């Protein structure tokens, strides 16, 4: 018993050290029995009475704890039992038994015979009864053995002296439970042991919220199988896919499947659904978060699933709830009518306000009016007689052709712009109207006289006339030869003498008038036969008179010339030197003076047979003379290759070859070859040269001279900063000379840009790209479509954008942009501004600033090219003269535009005293309220404005920012301050 007392004394010391840690259990463990937490005696039953003994000890908080000890090691045949009360299993099919104990090393007990043991047994018994049979009647067969427990560490007398206790922990599981509860029994066969703690628990998967689904506490299964658990959505959430998870045997959640989502009007926040606050909405459960109401809509209450449109704004039925509310467009602008007899072409510009939508369409309404003035004028719908091409309603482009109108009739056409919400607005539609009067044809042609090689015609103009007659067009051809060749002549007179005809040949003549409203129709035909040559002597007395006068006049002129040379050769030489060189080329032929010939561009569309235009202006090349070497690019119609051309009796040259891709239509073939028929009319060192075409075999080819350095924009970017100003001027001079030649031939390029200028090895620049189709759909610089393709907004003059009015003056505007591209080494005009912002900025007076290191005189020439009034822009001939003068006088290029601010202290900014005056000076007055609201009310405060602050103020256009910041630099120079902007 002495040993027992020693043990009972030492065991509490060990408990005090560890008890606090023993009471913290994981969340997934549910305790059914914990001996350390019992408030009083455990009341377990022991048998025999001298076996297991309940001992009460104090933990570090002076809370009593109950333990059981036994140490009957001196006597053999020990069989001491200890049994717990009924432990309710609470539905668990598997429970765990955790035993914490200390055990004395038998070898450390002096004088103990071989009866000492170092193990004990643990049993359990299932029962539905809370009262068990007395332990003295226990039969071991009634209990199921869990295990024999041995200590991993046992303590000795030395450990007792050193106050070192060794605590063992063993955990065993019991599965397959089915009854109400179970009893645990501990069997001692002669060990010295203390049960410090006995805990019975089961494992569960604790309550969890995952993917907005709540999964309840779930008891693990009776074996290692997973238990499938179905979750329920949290409040204000709904199932997207049935949420499920699996509870594992060790009490952990595995394999989440499915999820819940917050209902419309709610968003997920920290695992629950929170209502959208005012001003926000969530339209669909599939959306993750509440978002701010789209422009022109609002939500005044929480939980909004959609936002309501502001007054005057609407949302179409097909519009998503995330789309901004929109409104009907404003009226179209700038209507233009072009009358061609009984047909009218109507064009207009898109509405200034599209209503915020991209589905703008147009409808055209036609009324036929009586022509009376004032209130007595009566108009009625045109009815089905007028034909609209492509259609009358639902037009997607701002253009329509109206045909089959009645001649000499007043019409009113009203154009309205519509979009997807026009039908939702109660406001009346906004229209723009234009009045036109259909014109009448030229009256019948009259023959005045005819000769062997000429015919004189006369006619009367249209009456009444729609506008002023600009000119008349006379077309004639040999009878039965119309399909092969015909000639077009123009005159401002009501009569014309047609020369160069074949004697004794029958011709067909037709005449039509062109007024401000366009061309009229041809009025009838007149068939005339020229006289035979042998009829002149005895025939027309007029011819004899003309011949006699011609002979006499020639004789007199000859006498005068001889006298001039004899009397004063020097004086006549002086007179000749002052004479127009063109006058020397005059010749007398058949009694008439033949005037010098002026070349004029002939549009391929004037040919009824486009193939004839190709034959007239382009040389056919045998394909055997061409050798293709490599592909250098791809064009609109097919590949572009480099190769060699070898013509008979000529040296081999390098050429560029455009080929027409397979599967082309006849229309594509005509468009492809039309470029050749245009290029073939030009002969200038700064215009790309046509070598010829291949049309008699496939693929069809256009062969041009080869330009080694490719397009000018790419070439400049590749060689940024590597040329002198004089070299750049030489390039610009070549481009201007080529454009002067084109303008003198009455050819308008329409797409002059650095990308359409080619550069050869000698840095000679040549104008290219003369295609008729102007299909630029893949060009990122293009904007809205016209009859000739898309317009490259950044290079195009304002009148050409607004009214489709392309002239040599609009080419001059484009040339100014090319100048800017060249000096900036291929920088993109207007930088990253959108096309619409460019149109708006230019219309408000903004012009591109001088590129870096740009001479002042060059930037001024650019500004001259960008005059809003096209008549104020220089002609190409003037531009060439200006560039020649600058090249001859390099000193004029020294002053740089971007350094002029610092060199000249007297700037326009020096004369202003207020922010408002300053903004008006630089034509940025629309931003007065922006500056005032931001607190910039004095010029001193403006000195420190940066680009980021301009963004905050709402000055978003990049061009406007550059203009304001540039002027701020002038202000800083005047005030002696320099701030990084």
UniProtKB/Swiss-Prot annotation:
Binding site for ATP: 633-638, 658, 705-711, 755-756
Localization: Cell membrane
GO BP term, pick one: regulation of epithelial to mesenchymal transition
Enzyme Commission number(s) of this protein: 2.7.10.1
Domain Fibronectin type-III: residue ranges: 328-441, 442-533
Entry comment on modification after translation: Autophosphorylates upon activation by efna5.
Residue ranges crossing the lipid bilayer per the database entry: 546-566
GO cellular component, one term: receptor complex
Disulfide bonds: none
UniProt keyword ATP-binding present: yes
Modified residues (Phosphotyrosine): 601, 607, 706, 784, 927
Catalytic activity: L-tyrosyl-[protein] + ATP = O-phospho-L-tyrosyl-[protein] + ADP + H(+)
Stretches assigned to the SAM domain: 910-974
A Gene Ontology molecular function term of the record: ATP binding
Enzyme type, top EC level: transferase
Carbohydrate-modified residues: 340, 410, 435, 485
Tissue expr: Widely expressed in the developing zebrafish nervous system.
List of catalytic residues: 751
The organism's place on the tree of life at top rank: Eukaryota
Residue intervals annotated with topology Cytoplasmic: 567-981
Eph LBD domain sequence ranges: 29-210
Main location (coarse class): membrane
Family annotation (PANTHER family): EPH RECEPTOR A5, RECEPTOR PROTEIN-TYROSINE KINASE
Subunit structure: Heterotetramer upon binding of the ligand. The heterotetramer is composed of an ephrin dimer and a receptor dimer. Oligomerization is probably required to induce biological responses.
Protein's name in the database: Ephrin type-A receptor 3
Gene: epha3
